[in-house]
Amino acid sequence: MKVSCEDVNGPRSSLGRAWNHVSWLYYQYLLVTALYMLEPWERTVFNSMLVSIVGMALYTGYIFMPQHILAILHYFEIVQ
């Protein structure tokens, strides 16, 4: 038996609407990236790689961007 969020939270509850919106966004993500054609294990591999790459990019930006911004400010003599 499949239980939808409307059965648990009611069709008009804010949690049910939020769940429906997140489900819709995930569905759009699957359609835009064409992941709906992949098998579940392939989708998991793709999503894992995507999360890893985005995580590394965010971490690198967090670590190195302040140094680069400070170097630019020193170069243009905005900060002494």
Curated annotation (Swiss-Prot):
Q: What is its main location?
A: endoplasmic reticulum
- Describe its membrane topology: Multi-pass membrane protein
Q: Which residues lie on this side of the membrane: Lumenal?
A: 39-43
Q: Which residues lie on this side of the membrane: Cytoplasmic?
A: 1-21, 67-80
Keyword check for ATP-binding, yes or no.
no
Q: Keywords assigned by UniProt?
A: Endoplasmic reticulum, Lipid metabolism, Membrane, Sphingolipid metabolism, Transmembrane, Transmembrane helix
* Domain of life the protein comes from: Eukaryota
UniProt record, GO biological process: ceramide biosynthetic process
Check the record and name the Pfam families matching this protein. SPT_ssu-like (PF11779)
What does the UniProt entry say about where the protein is found? Endoplasmic reticulum membrane
Q: Where are the transmembrane segments?
A: 22-38, 44-66
Record GO terms (molecular function): serine C-palmitoyltransferase activity
Q: Is Cell division found in the keyword set?
A: no
- Spell out the subunit comment: Component of the serine palmitoyltransferase (SPT) complex, which is composed of SPTLC1, SPTLC2 or SPTLC3 and SPTSSA or SPTSSB. The heterodimer consisting of SPTLC1 and SPTLC2/SPTLC3 forms the catalytic core of the enzyme, while SPTSSA or SPTSSB subunits determine substrate specificity. SPT also interacts with ORMDL proteins, especially ORMDL3, which negatively regulate SPT activity in the presence of ceramides.
Q: Describe the family membership recorded for this protein in Swiss-Prot or TrEMBL.
A: Belongs to the SPTSS family. SPTSSA subfamily.
Put simply, this protein is called Serine palmitoyltransferase small subunit A-B
Q: Which organism is it from?
A: Xenopus laevis (African clawed frog)
Biological classification of the source: Eukaryota, Metazoa, Chordata, Craniata, Vertebrata
